[in-house]
């Protein structure tokens, strides 16, 4: 029996077969590309951490440079702290995540061994406005944080405020917000405050009893990742 190619049945069968074939091909391609995608994600993360450490990797292999400098990872619950040895000095790198004006923002904050002085920062964003909020990734904004302290005079973790020029934070060190990008700048300020609070257990080890996360922090033990 000859199949009528103009019939509804033929159209349905043809469409179903094509959908199945395309779905299978997409699944195969996705599986084939998955390892490369994961490798790219890891490399981007390593580059961002090196950026927070102010390491120029343009003339070398960033993955190899990262492996030499970042020699440990500490885990506090679901939070990770990367430990680097930079010219014989210990640096702690904390991942950051928050919200900007149009989407997510994030980055990495590098602290000196005193867990107080900011060594460097590296920010990223999903969709902030070019020339305005997107400037959080640029050096003039990032360099303001270098040398700032996240603790107040009493040793409590209070973060660093991002404020419009002329405004002053009470009991906090501060940097200037980006002109014309109030919401993104506020997002960076909130991101730092919230994320540092989430790292209270790590930050307050060896720094007295001050804590931003409540009275149960002492029950959380740091765990080193297995190599």
Regions found by a protein language model. Give the residues of each.
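Flexible, solvent-exposed loop/hinge segments and secondary-structure transition points
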Residues: 2-227
């Amino acid at each position: 029996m000859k199949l009528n190619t103009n019939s509804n049945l033929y159209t349905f069968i043809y469409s179903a077969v094509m959908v199945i074939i395309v779905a299978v091909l997409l699944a195969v391609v996705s599986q084939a590309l998955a390892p490369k995608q994961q490798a790219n994600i890891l490399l981007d993360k390593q580059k961002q951490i090196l950026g927070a450490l102010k390491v120029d990797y343009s003339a070398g292999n960033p993955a190899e440079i990262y492996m030499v400098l970042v020699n440990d990872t500490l885990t506090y619950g679901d939070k990770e702290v990367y430990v680097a040895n930079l010219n014989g000095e210990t640096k702690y790198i904390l991942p950051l995540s928050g919200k900007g004006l149009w989407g997510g923002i994030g980055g990495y904050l590098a602290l000196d061994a005193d867990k107080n002085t900011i060594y460097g920062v590296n920010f990223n964003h999903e969709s902030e406005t070019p020339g305005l909020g997107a400037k959080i990734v640029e050096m003039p904004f990032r360099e303001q944080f270098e040398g700032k302290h996240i603790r107040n005079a009493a040793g409590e973790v209070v973060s660093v405020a991002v404020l419009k020029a002329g405004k002053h934070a009470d009991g906090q060190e501060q940097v200037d917000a980006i002109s014309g990008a109030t919401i993104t700048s506020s997002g960076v300020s909130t991101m730092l405050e919230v994320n540092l609070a989430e790292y209270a257990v790590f930050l307050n080890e060896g720094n007295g009893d001050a804590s931003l996360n409540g009275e149960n922090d002492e029950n959380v033990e740091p765990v080193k990742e297995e190599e």
